[in-house]
Structures are given as structure tokens and as C-alpha cells.
Design a protein with these regions (language model features):
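Long, well-ordered core segments of solenoidal/helical folds
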Residues: 31-44, 90-109, 147-169, 200-220, ...
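Solvent-exposed loop and edge beta-strand segments that line ligand/cofactor-binding
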Residues: 55-68, 107-125, 164-180, 217-233, ...
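Well-ordered alpha-helical scaffold segments within catalytic/enzyme domains
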Residues: 69-82, 86, 127-144, 182-196, ...
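Carbohydrate-active enzyme catalytic cores, enriched for enzymes
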Residues: 233-234, 238-386
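Catalytic core of carbohydrate-active enzymes
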Residues: 356-434
Length: 548
């Protein structure tokens, strides 16, 4: 396979061409954060056991991923500044520390049954094998032979033999981002290490990739949300791009119509230049793998998303190194333009007006990285979401266990949807909604709740200077309309002011404002504000007007 990672002229251009300065700035900023005056973090037994005892993965993950950031930074610096022997020395130290890790799996991904299994295959163990294989290929002429021997032995034991000796692995049945990340990483690692062994497992790798595509809607959308599109599609594209170099031009995996549609998904779900749709376990902040968008621009001529969102993820060497190799300074990104996006199969509708952006979803409550959120909607001004979807909560054992929906972000209580007869929405595919797009946008929500409901329909009228959201219902003895926002509401002249937008509602409804402190995905405290509306008299309709 052509060793594209070692193209000396390309790396010379990165160093000397002033158009690459933003990338070099990002590299040295990460160096200052993760490497300068920092030792390789020691991962202790108590770090390993923290998740088992408390369900908190923060302490272990911080050290684990800092090591991978150091790995990426030093390896890339070695290519740009080959005369600096200190970078190579530091890199080899990090490589050996990673090779010494008891397992390449994070503690949260090791089951309680086989916690002593050192060669388990899950997201980050598969990634680690790939990172080391690519660094070995990239610096084969500079790494100490003992380091090369160690990398080869650990990859063989932890990735290649582990995969060859296991059949019908649980990860081979998944249809989420895991399929692309695990399958792509394993496949590329085999490519780098052994042609003969790769072709023996190629059919299994193709199963991973086909499973990943099966989890994508026919119109190219993913219910996992923007962040997991960015993750899974990154490894899908990376695998087939690497495969095309391996077999000299075979790009079949990238020529499928669904893949072409997928390529445009990310750019299509922006609400403004900084914010995206944050349904499911997403952040709502437009941050994308820089290399991926430049690759997709070259391959599919996609609409480039706002350049400020371009991100080099130094936790993932293979994505980080490609940012430097695939970056094209001539690719420019325009501001997000007004327009509509309708993913019928996914049941998402997004519309961008001059003054605001809007998104609403239906689907079902058994999706990947599911939230119970049928009928949930987002409204953003030109700066931020003012009626928000909170997106992903902090990842803990609870978040992926039987009590997932006790977490505010994940339950319907944490979304802008009604509470009906004192109940939140149900969990599972049996609880669903129907999105209808015509003159108005509407969601039939009556099947999203445990109790039988005659009628519960949310309709939205979008105008240039604002929108109206109307819920109509019958066969309900108690209803509480709920809105979620991160903005502290200001009540003025009977209106609710959220960052300049004016919300008005029917006078025969009573407003109760409260707040709640939740944990963000990063583990920080965040105060969110809950706007609850209760009818003063019997009614079968609630209308909310939002003016900009």
C-alpha cells in the first residue's frame, strides 16, 4: 500500500506554506495543553476501578485520552520537524506507556464478567490499534526497532489475533457508529499489518460497514445525531479511502447513493452559523472533523459547513493526521443560508429563516442514543438556541443502564413536550409520532404516551419574523405544556423574553417558571430553566407565539 502518511513533500508544505498556519497554531495550542511540562499520566488500579465502584468514567478517561492526545501531537510534530529528536523521544515514551496498558478498552466498555480480558475489542481499543499501526507505518524509518517490535506484538495480540480467534462478536451485530469505528479500525489495522490476514477477514469487515449503513436512514440521516454522524462517518470514510489506496483505486464503498446523501447530512442540519440540531446525544455545537469535510468536499462537492467548526481531534491520531494531509486552503465555507431540510425517513424537519432557525422531530422512542422526545422542537436566534434540546448528558453507568430515563436530558421531562395526565412519554419503539410536512409542519404525538389519548397534535406555522406552535388535544384530563431553555427568562408585559425573542401565550394559561441544575456532557453544572403552562379553565388548545 502506498504510504500516503509519509509523503515528505506534503509535510514540507505543511511546515512552510503560510496557509497551513491555522493548523500549526492548533497543533501547538494542543502541545501547550497536553504535552508541555506534562508527564505521561499514570493510570492506577483505583482509576481502573472507579467506574465499577461509582459509575463515573471521568477520572479514568481524562488520563486515558490525555495519553492519546500526547501520542498524536508528538507523532505529527515528528513529521513536521524531523530534526527535533526530543519529539521522537517523547513519542516513543508515550507509545511504550500505551503498550503497557493492561487493556486498551476504557473501563466503561469492559464488562463486569470479563474485566480481566486484556484483548477485548470495543471502540477505543480498536482505535488504539489503528493509531499505533499508522504511526509505525509513518515513522518506520525513525522509530527504534524495539519500539516497532513492541507495537507489532501488541497489535498482533490485542487486535489481530483477538479478532481472528473470535467469531460472531457482539460488535459485529451493531448498526450504530460502533460498527463503522470498530470495523473500520480493525480493517485498517489488518491492512497495515498483513495483506494475507486482511483478505481472510475482509468479508467480516464488510459486514461491519454494511451494518453501519443499515443504521442510516435511506435519505442519509442518522437518529444518533450530529456528533455521532461526525464520529461514525469519519471512520467509514477513512476506511474506504484507505482501502482505495490499498487496492489501487477501488472506491466502491464510497460510491453508494446512500453514502452520497450521508455526506451532505451534517451541513444540512445547522440552525445558524454556530449551532446545530442537538436531538439525541449531541452537543448542538458545530464542531466537525476537519479532514472529513475536506475529503467530502473533494469527493462529493458538499456544501462546506462554517469554517469555525473545523476541529482537529487530537484524541484520535488517525483523524488528526489526516487534517494536515487532506486540508485544502482553497475550500471556503459560506455562512449558513436560509432554506429547508426534510428527512422524511428520519422524521426530522429543519428550516432556517433570516432571523431564526427551527427544528422538530417525530420518530420513535427506541432509537440509537435515544431520548424520549417525540414532538420536541428547537428554536435558535442568530447566536444560540433559545428553546433548546439539551442534547447529551454526562456519560455514566446510569446513562447507559436501566435508569437512563431518570436523567433529565434523556426523559421527555427535559424536552419541550407536554406532560399528559401526569405522565411523561414512554420508552421504546412502541411509542412514536408521525411528522407531516405540508403548508404547516405537524406532529401527531398521541402514540408517544403510555395512556390512550384521543388526540394530541402539535402544528407549527413558520413566518419570516417568528413562528406559532399550537397543540390541540382531546381525551386528556390533565396537561402541562413545557418549554426548556438555557436562557434566564425575563417576564415583561405578559411576555417571556429570551435573548431578545418575545414569547406570548394564551391568557387562560398559567405560567410557572423553575430552574434545575444538570450535568453537562463534560460533567460541569448547568442551570436550565423550565417554563410550565397549566390551563386555568378547561381547554383543548395551547398556542405559543415567538416573535423576533
Amino acid at each position: 500500500m502506498q504510504n500516503f502518511l509519509r509523503e515528505r513533500e506534503k509535510w514540507k508544505n505543511v511546515r512552510e506554506n503560510p496557509q497551513y498556519k491555522p493548523l500549526l497554531d492548533a497543533l501547538f495550542e494542543e502541545y501547550d495543553r497536553s504535552c508541555k511540562d506534562k508527564e505521561i499520566p499514570l493510570i492506577t488500579f483505583s482509576d481502573e476501578m472507579d467506574f465499577t465502584k461509582t459509575g463515573d468514567r471521568t477520572r479514568f478517561n481524562k488520563k486515558y485520552f490525555l495519553r492519546r492526545k500526547q501520542l498524536s501531537v508528538y507523532a505529527i510534530l515528528c513529521m513536521i520537524y524531523p530534526e527535533n529528536e526530543e519529539y521522537l523521544e517523547k513519542l516513543q515514551d508515550v507509545i511504550c506507556a500505551i503498550c503497557n496498558e493492561y487493556s486498551w478498552q476504557i473501563s466503561a466498555h469492559r464488562s463486569r464478567i470479563d474485566r480481566n480480558k486484556r484483548d477485548g475489542l470495543s471502540l477505543f481499543s480498536c482505535e488504539t490499534g489503528l493509531f499505533l499501526a499508522e504511526i509505525k507505518q509513518m515513522l518506520i524509518d525513525r522509530l527504534d526497532p524495539l519500539v516497532i517490535e513492541r507495537i507489532t506484538a501488541e497489535i498482533d495480540k490485542r487486535i489481530l489475533k483477538s479478532f481472528e480467534n473470535s467469531h460472531n462478536l457482539w460488535i459485529e451485530t451493531l448498526k450504530s457508529n460502533w460498527a463503522a469505528v470498530c470495523g473500520g479500525s480493525i480493517g485498517m489495522t489488518f491492512m497495515y499489518e498483513s495483506s494475507e490476514r486482511f483478505y481472510k477477514v475482509n468479508d467480516r469487515i464488510n459486514t461491519f460497514m454494511n451494518n453501519y449503513l443499515d443504521g442510516i436512514s435511506d435519505d442519509g440521516g442518522t437518529s444518533e445525531g450530529a456528533d455521532y454522524w461526525n464520529y461514525g462517518f469519519c471512520f467509514y470514510a477513512m476506511y474506504f479511502d484507505t482501502f482505495s489506496k490499498y487496492v489501487r483505486g477501488n472506491t466502491a464503498g464510497l460510491e453508494k447513493e446512500k453514502v452520497r446523501k450521508m455526506a451532505n447530512f451534517y451541513s444540512s442540519i445547522y440552525l445558524n452559523d454556530k449551532n446545530m440540531v442537538s436531538f439525541s446525544d449531541s452537543s448542538g455545537v458545530g464542531e466537525y472533523h476537519l479532514w472529513l469535510m475536506h475529503f467530502l468536499k473533494e469527493k462529493f462537492d458538499i456544501v462546506m459547513p462554517p469554517k469555525d467548526g473545523g476541529w482537529i481531534d487530537f484524541e484520535k491520531f488517525s483523524a488528526a493526521v489526516r487534517a494536515f494531509l487532506y486540508y485544502n486552503p482553497s475550500n471556503t465555507a459560506d455562512s449558513i443560508k436560509s432554506g429547508k431540510t426534510y428527512y422524511e425517513k428520519l422524521s426530522w424537519y429543519i428550516e432556517r429563516k433570516e432571523k431564526y432557525g427551527f427544528a422538530i422531530k417525530a420518530g420513535h422512542n427506541g432509537e440509537e442514543h435515544n431520548h424520549n422526545d417525540i414532538g420536541s422542537f428547537i428554536v435558535a436566534n442568530k447566536r444560540k438556541q433559545i428553546l433548546c434540546d439539551l442534547g447529551s448528558a454526562q456519560y455514566t453507568a446510569v446513562n447507559f443502564g436501566k435508569d437512563r430515563y431518570t436523567i433529565f436530558n434523556n426523559s421527555s421531562l427535559g424536552h419541550s413536550v407536554p406532560i399528559v395526565n401526569g405522565s411523561e412519554q414512554g420508552t421504546g419503539k412502541d411509542f412514536y409520532g408521525t411528522l407531516i410536512v405540508s403548508d404547516k409542519i405537524s406532529v401527531d404525538m398521541k402514540n408517544a404516551y403510555p395512556e390512550k389519548i384521543e388526540k394530541l397534535t402539535r402544528s407549527v406555522e413558520l413566518k419570516e419574523n417568528g413562528l406559532a406552535v399550537t397543540d390541540e388535544f382531546s381525551g386528556i384530563f390533565e396537561i402541562k405544556e413545557r418549554l426548556i431553555t438555557k436562557e434566564k427568562p425575563v417576564i415583561s408585559d405578559g411576555k417571556i423574553i429570551l435573548d431578545g425573542a418575545a414569547l406570548s401565550y394564551d391568557g387562560d394559561w398559567k405560567l410557572v417558571c423553575s430552574d434545575k441544575v444538570i450535568k453537562t456532557h463534560e460533567g460541569n453544572n448547568l442551570t436550565v430553566f423550565i417554563l410550565d403552562f397549566m390551563p386555568k379553565t378547561k381547554t383543548e388548545k395551547f398556542t405559543l407565539n415567538i416573535d423576533f
